[in-house]
Amino acid sequence: MPATSMEELVSLCKRRGFIFQGSEIYGGLQGFWDYGPLGVELKNNIKASWWRANVYERDDMEGLDAAIIMHRLVLRHSGHEATFSDPMVDNRKTKKRYRLDHLVKDQKPDVVAQVAEGIGESVENFAAVVAALVAHPAKAAEVLVAAGVRDPFSGEVGDWTEPRPFNMMFKTSIGPVADEDSFGYLRPETAQGIFTNFKNVVDSTSRRLPFGIAQIGKAFRNEITPRNFIFRVRELEQMEIEFFCTPGTDEAWHQHWLEARLAWWEAQGIPREKIQILDVPKEDLAHYSKRTYDLMYNYPTLGYEEIEGIANRTDFDLGSHTKAQAELGIQARVEENFDSVAKLTIPHPETNKPVVPFVIEPSAGVDRAMLAVLAEAYTKETLENGSERIVLKLKPHLAPIKVAVIPLARNREEITSVAKAIKAKLQSLGLGRVLYEDSGNIGKAYRRHDEVGTPYCVTVDFETVGKGEDPALTDTVTVRDRDTLGQERVRISELANWLQARLR
């Protein structure tokens, strides 16, 4: 069965070199994580699978890698300067700060109910409770104290301030002079780089509607309370598509991308029945969204949380960044833009008249994807002899190590030389990482590779080099299957094809 607690995953990730705390030798830095030898392989494999499915295997997609630091005008006209914020409260007693919705949600049910009652909303509609607290800050401070909202740090009822917005973008100075005219932002999402490069991509590729632009890259959000391992972090990586289509076809494309993304998650080992589709209520939609589907995965300990959002952003984004807005018939409500120097239109495929396209955006976080893949693959099994093993039943294309080549005797040159030659041959096939494993104890090596998700272990033994009891086994190796524990003798000359057929 999959992992049932976050602690199991955290322990495995630290022990086996998937994920480490950022800046750990100096006490760590909250909200920042480093990916170790196996973590970087798994992360890269997830990204490669996404890129292959959405760029290489489609005829309507282009790729992009935009800059991380953005001109502040980009994020002003996108709405981020004004709206990219979370409500924050302080406890005057402990001097700790918390994101309001997280603080209330984590209280005991009776306390949450008292907060809802105090602010005049139903406890069944938590979003409305938070919205009311934000809308009435003075009353909110009184309600939090009266309801007995406790500080997670001290465990005592806090002396809470009025909620106030906290903008989550990281500012940075650009150039040698640090003043108000020289600052920019670390991008809070990868999407804006796609929108600002829309005309460049269209002009350089001669694309016509419908088509998309895909990007994988880092984004930065100064979360008030980062938590839950790599689920909510301050430095994250996104896999985003902005799919441009003719107004009026957007709803059909929205459904298309919902199905396409569900199919991709299933191919990563997360069945459709493990994902809930949340049609986000109108009152909870982002300022740019006409309709959004949130794909919700049942994370251990956390419960159902968003793993991907698929939004119909209408013509808001290109309409916000284009010049000559008044003459383009933009349907979304956008702020006036007298700063842009580009007209972000494309010929309508039927009328050939300039049109500002609608946008469908599938947006997934690499870190959350990795956490879900690990949680779903994590399995505890009781073997016939009563012992327990932990195995990561990762899809082969995601496994950090594809094959481990193990010499049965690491001090016998005739065996190790064959094992090293096999490793070199398999590595040259382009399957992914192949590991030469000479730790000594074959049983422990098998268990270790079960735990990190290696699909196959290839053992070179005395029979392989013609020093066993059965001459027929010369030039063969034992291949062990991670999931079935089955073992099969395969001729060295056939090994590459045997593995390629199972790992592709």
From Swiss-Prot:
- The positions annotated for binding ATP are 221-223, 231-236, 306-307, 365-368
Q: Which GO terms describe its biological process?
A: glycyl-tRNA aminoacylation
Which keywords does UniProt give here? Aminoacyl-tRNA synthetase, ATP-binding, Cytoplasm, Ligase, Nucleotide-binding, Protein biosynthesis
Indicate where this protein resides in the cell: Cytoplasm
The catalytic activity, as recorded, is:
tRNA(Gly) + glycine + ATP = glycyl-tRNA(Gly) + AMP + diphosphate
| Annotated EC | 6.1.1.14
Which Gene3D superfamilies does this entry report, sorted A to Z?
Answer: 3.30.40.230, Anticodon-binding domain (3.40.50.800), Bira Bifunctional Protein, Domain 2 (3.30.930.10)
- Disulfide pairs here are none
**According to the lineage, what is the superkingdom?**
Bacteria
Question: Which residues hold substrate?
Answer: R99, E189, L236, E237, Q238, M239, E240, E361, P362, S363, A364, G365
Among SUPFAM superfamilies, the record links this protein to: Class II aaRS ABD-related, Class II aaRS and biotin synthetases
Keyword Protein biosynthesis assigned to the entry: answer is: yes
Q: Which CDD domains match?
A: GlyRS-like_core, GlyRS_anticodon
Q: How does it assemble?
A: Homodimer.
**Similarity-based family:** Belongs to the class-II aminoacyl-tRNA synthetase family.
What job does the chain carry out? Catalyzes the attachment of glycine to tRNA(Gly).
Q: Which NCBIfam families match?
A: glyS_dimeric, PRK04173.1
**Protein name per UniProt:** Glycine--tRNA ligase
- Provide the species name: Deinococcus geothermalis (strain DSM 11300 / CIP 105573 / AG-3a)
Query: Which lineage is the organism of this entry classified under, starting from the top rank?
Result: Bacteria, Thermotogati, Deinococcota, Deinococci, Deinococcales
